[in-house]
């Protein structure tokens, strides 16, 4: 099976992020087969075949063939290893370890893609046998996990190695990853009560130590927290040592509570009560070696605080009371280390007959044929995928831009938004989760709410006094990942002309800008000038910040909010007609 698609995406991403000056130091060369970029390489040069598309999703120019050509002898480099070693040789010596790490990430992604291809048919068949071949009729919290399985087999919209997970084997993926829809029991750790910070009731979920094979004497003075099986070995031992808990905390020999992984993998749903999710730290990384899937203890309280702010906003906006729901993320515990933590996420009640689809699953192939979006359109939108995507965009952009008016931008990407469909209700409702990485502008929040809720966050980056920080986050998450990616995706699948789909996004954003007001300094005016009418838009530089460069080299305060720019595909002049 060819790995060319991964290499093609890698080359386009490195070009967009200008790794080793691939964009800024290259000159264009026109050869008989098309355009190439020539990058000087010591006493030689590397040639990259490119094409220009208008509009393109975050690219002005992209790779058109999965290769680099060495100018001196015509040698073609056609593997990610060969390409990255050639480019890494041009990097600052301080950055070469990052290129070596990216080589490894590419190999992991290629291996995972091959594994997915080999198992796609069997997994979809198994889901169809269990839940039915039409996912529009998959209802309730248990069936929602099957959508996660479909979504986990898709590429990330921006990151070229998004399917890879650092340090995990194929056996690990089959046993614990959402794309295989496994079921497995949790491990448990008995922690001294005085070492555990907790909020909310955990006793009904967490068994006493004696029920897990530990001495009964630990029932007094110790409390248990769940541990992911992948964390229960050496990573846990190292965490206990770092937290000063070696010999004081005890891993129980007996597992308890079967769970099923959600799309994020580190979050699992209780098999017997799938409306309850447990977010558990994992000693792995996704979307870059620096993007570790642990849980910093301070983020737990931050997420709960943001949830309270969103509740206050929703109370002032009646149209969202029934249409935008929030998972409860106020119950959590930690023992002072990023591998010793748990967030207990409760889904809202009343979803047993609801079709709950993560936004990330819309473009996934359905077990019975077509896309998930097609089957949802058939059942809920009269067979019209355009009506479906317009309804989704209307709800998403109304919510996101309303929050901008309050000085809030959420990191609600395609994995954190679930579409809720019920018979006889207009359009999808939204279910939101994971609120720990927003940007909040205190002055705008105070002006809109009439008061300023407590903004005492563990992460000082949450509070900003810069409108640009809000708009950058809104653009890179809501516009690119939750809207633009689906316009380009549906067009790629032949569902509608791209210009029509982009027009829907533009129209909904323009409506939102008008509703926010267009006076000087208003958020509506900024939305128009810095998003709708801007020549270029911020784009996440995920490979640079997450893998290629250490933080001190990239200057990234937050690797998930480190940006380059790309052409604005929403400009009317960019429509290909």
How would you describe each model-predicted region?
Residues 1-394, 422-577:
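Nucleotide/phosphate-binding site architecture used for ATP/NTP-dependent chemistry
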């Amino acid at each position: 099976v060819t790995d060319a698609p991964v290499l093609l995406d890698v080359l386009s991403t490195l070009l967009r992020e200008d790794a080793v000056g691939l964009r800024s130091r290259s000159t264009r060369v026109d050869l008989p087969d098309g355009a190439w970029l020539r990058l000087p390489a010591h006493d030689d040069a590397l040639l990259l075949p490119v094409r220009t598309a208008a509009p393109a999703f975050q690219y002005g120019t992209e790779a058109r063939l999965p290769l680099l050509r060495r100018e001196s002898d015509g040698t073609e480099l056609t593997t990610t290893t060969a390409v990255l070693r050639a480019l890494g040789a041009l990097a600052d010596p301080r950055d070469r370890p990052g290129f070596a790490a990216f080589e490894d990430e590419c190999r992991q992604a290629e291996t995972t893609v091959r594994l997915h291809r080999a198992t796609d048919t069997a997994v979809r068949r198994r889901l169809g046998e269990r839940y039915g071949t039409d996912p529009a009729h998959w209802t309730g919290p248990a069936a929602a996990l099957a959508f996660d399985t479909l979504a986990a087999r898709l590429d990330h919209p921006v990151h070229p190695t998004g399917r890879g997970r650092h340090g995990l084997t194929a056996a690990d993926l089959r046993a614990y990853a959402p794309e295989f829809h496994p079921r497995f029991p949790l491990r448990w750790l008995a922690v001294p009560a005085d070492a555990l910070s907790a909020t909310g009731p955990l006793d009904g979920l967490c068994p006493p130590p004696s029920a897990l094979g530990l001495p009964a004497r630990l029932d007094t003075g110790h409390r248990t927290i769940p541990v992911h099986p992948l964390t229960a070995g050496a990573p846990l031992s190292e965490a206990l040592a770092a937290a000063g808990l070696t010999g004081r905390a005890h891993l129980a020999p007996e597992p308890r509570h079967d769970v099923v992984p959600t799309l994020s993998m580190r979050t699992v749903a209780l098999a017997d009560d799938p409306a309850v999710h447990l977010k558990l730290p994992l000693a792995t990384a996704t979307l870059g070696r620096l993007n570790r899937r642990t849980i910093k203890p301070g983020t737990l309280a931050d997420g709960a605080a943001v949830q309270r702010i969103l509740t206050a906003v929703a109370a002032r906006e009646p149209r969202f009371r029934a249409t935008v729901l929030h998972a409860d993320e106020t119950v959590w515990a930690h023992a002072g280390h990023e591998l010793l933590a748990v967030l207990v996420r409760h889904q809202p009640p009343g979803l047993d007959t609801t079709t709950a689809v993560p936004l990330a699953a819309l473009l996934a192939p359905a077990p019975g044929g077509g896309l998930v979006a097609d089957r949802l359109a058939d059942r809920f939108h009269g067979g019209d995928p355009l009506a479906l995507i317009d309804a989704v965009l209307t709800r998403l952009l109304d919510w996101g831009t309303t929050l901008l008016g309050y000085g809030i931008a959420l990191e609600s990407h395609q994995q954190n938004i679930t579409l809720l469909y019920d018979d006889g209700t207009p359009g999808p409702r939204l279910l939101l989760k994971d609120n720990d990485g927003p940007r909040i502008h205190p002055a705008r929040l105070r002006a809109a709410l009439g008061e300023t809720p407590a903004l005492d966050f563990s992460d000082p980056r949450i509070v900003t006094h810069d409108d640009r920080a809000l708009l950058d986050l809104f653009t890179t998450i809501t516009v690119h990942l939750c809207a633009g990616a689906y316009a380009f995706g549906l067009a790629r699948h032949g569902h509608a002309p791209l210009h029509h789909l982009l027009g829907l996004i533009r129209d909904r954003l323009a409506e939102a800008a008008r509703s926010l007001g267009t006076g000087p300094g208003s958020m509506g005016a900024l939305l128009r000038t810095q998003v709708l009418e801007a020549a270029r838009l911020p784009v996440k530089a995920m490979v640079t910040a997450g893998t290629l460069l250490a933080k001190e080299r990239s200057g990234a305060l937050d690797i998930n909010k480190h940006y380059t720019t790309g052409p604005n595909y929403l400009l009317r002049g960019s429509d290909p007609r």
